[in-house]
Amino acid sequence: MKTLSEFIVERQAEYPNAKGELSGILSSIRLLAKIIHRDINKAGLTNILGQSGIENVQGESQMKLDLFAHNTMKAALMAREEVAGFASEEEESFIAFDTERGRNAKYIILTDPLDGSSNIDVNVSVGTIFSIYRRVSPIGSPVTLEDFMQPGNKQVAAGYIVYGSSTMLVYTTGNGVNGFTYDPSIGTFCLSHENMQMPKEGKIYSINEGQYLKFPQGVKKYIKYCQEEDKATHRPYVSRYIGSLVADFHRNLLKGGIYIYPSATNYPNGKLRLLYEGNPIAFLAEQAGGVATDGYRRILDIEPTALHERVPLFVGSEDMVKKAQEMMEEFKE
């Protein structure tokens, strides 16, 4: 069975001019996944469950594991000579690695260190999301905000780690999506899902229907469409919502479906973050044959205006996302 290390080396060999910098970053993320996997698996036995008593930049209560994952990822990336800077959902501003090797590095990382962390107390799957870009500021100087404010179509790699019944690392470098399952008996990620493809049609819709009254009219119509009986389109669809973006998306990637986190009266711009969640998930979806929009526009074409910008997200099987967008367009003001 092929390991993640072997896979990375093989892919690097396909590019004669590659210097191994991106491979080095992916190796750091592999190590990070092992560390977080270890601590999540013993979370109930150590004092890292529950709230930390601190709020993040969005005014949300940080869980202890949020801070642990954030600090672990920051430390792992600071140790890499390929990384010039880092931005996290948990920090108000980006972090420039202002050392000689940091100033001469080519890549920056954006991350949601622990997505769905509010679920960890009840043993529900959580995940880590990451996004990698080439910096646009001059090499030899510290990174700037401009380096992090790039549209998603400029990503060179993106992925997630899902910590569930097994731990999986799924990533793309723009040449398909591959998944690796962690074997704790040998401490290695092994290729388990090669060239992952999202079904064009799906039967699962994932949305928090408890917020139904706050949703736009187009979303309400699409929910009703999913619930209607129609043999020709295999409806009604199945409602499955975990409340952890990584876990919901991972299931729909494998089985086919749509994940929706729309705007709402209490979140007029949506709740998910464009740079930390929207862009990397959209990149993965498209590389697997899926579609990702904000209800009207392709996610990867949105020009960011703020580091913690929020965005509605409709992502999943092509036919389902297009149908939802059609209904959103119908009620567009």
UniProtKB/Swiss-Prot annotation:
Leading EC class: hydrolase
Catalytic activity: beta-D-fructose 1,6-bisphosphate + H2O = beta-D-fructose 6-phosphate + phosphate
Keywords on record: Carbohydrate metabolism, Cytoplasm, Hydrolase, Magnesium, Metal-binding
Cofactor: binding comment: Binds 2 magnesium ions per subunit.
Chain positions recorded as Mg(2+) 2 binding sites: 112, 115, 277
Gene3D superfamilies the record matches: 3.40.190.80, Fructose-1,6-Bisphosphatase, subunit A, domain 1
Enzyme Commission number(s): 3.1.3.11
Taxonomic classification: Bacteria, Pseudomonadati, Pseudomonadota, Gammaproteobacteria, Pasteurellales
Organism: Haemophilus influenzae (strain ATCC 51907 / DSM 11121 / KW20 / Rd)
Family (UniProt): Belongs to the FBPase class 1 family.
Keyword Transmembrane helix listed: no
InterPro entries xrefs: FBPase_C_dom, FBPase_class-1, FBPase_N, FBPtase, Fructose_bisphosphatase_AS
Record GO cellular component, one term: cytoplasm
Binding-site list for Mg(2+) 1: 89, 112, 114
Self-association state and partner proteins as the record states: Homotetramer.
PANTHER family membership: FRUCTOSE-1,6-BISPHOSPHATASE-RELATED, SEDOHEPTULOSE-1,7-BISPHOSPHATASE, CHLOROPLASTIC
Binding site for substrate: 115-118, 208, 241, 271
Protein's recorded name: Fructose-1,6-bisphosphatase class 1
